[in-house]
Amino acid sequence: DGFIDYLFQKPCRGSKSYGKRASEVPTLSSGTVKKCYNILTLGFETAKRWNYISEIPNTKGPSEHYKKRKAWSSEHISKILDQIQDDPILHLSVHLAFNCSLRAGEIVAIDINSINLNEGSMWISQILERVSDESLKTLSKEKIAKVFPKQFSNAKSRLVLKTPKTEGSLRKQYLTRPLVQEIKERIAEINKTKELLGPEYQDNGILICQSEGRPVDQNKLCKSFKE
């Protein structure tokens, strides 16, 4: 029971902690703690048989609690989009999020080649996350599509383009006509910048990127939206 309590108080690592004060980092969710508990219980019988423990702990697994998210009305979404018209990248990101129910890590990883403008659809096939140097060593190479260079040499993490955590996250999304038009304008802007910068442009094939082609950190995108 003490170990379960410890897990509930343990701060998250990875993309949920980067760029945040210690007080802002969330603790492990009930779902994550439940998974840890299930893994531990699988080994109790073997541990007893090998005399690592004298008896199997009689503990009750933690309950999972789900937070209900309040859905925004179409009127509220339209109002928000109107307020951020002067920021094309943020506007397109928010438009994509609401139209396709995308997470931030999926938005900043959209592959231009996965978009079918004639059909009005796109495939969600990868995510972009900030990964610590230590965690990168243990990450399966099969899941990694691309590791981006560090912007600062003394940084202890870097952005990584990788496959989704589950097969269910790989999916096809359909786009509304206004969103298709906005994506067309974005791609035209990217092509224009490519011509202007030439070899200095970092072409990563990503729809939501910085002016010179570098990827956008999802934490910065979320921060821009909150502001």
Regions found by a protein language model. Give the residues of each.
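Hydrophobic (often cysteine-bearing) scaffold residues that line and stabilize catalytic clefts
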Residues: 32, 36-39, 73, 89-90, ...
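Conserved tyrosine-mediated DNA breakage-rejoining catalytic core shared by Y-recombinases
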Residues: 76, 110-192, 202
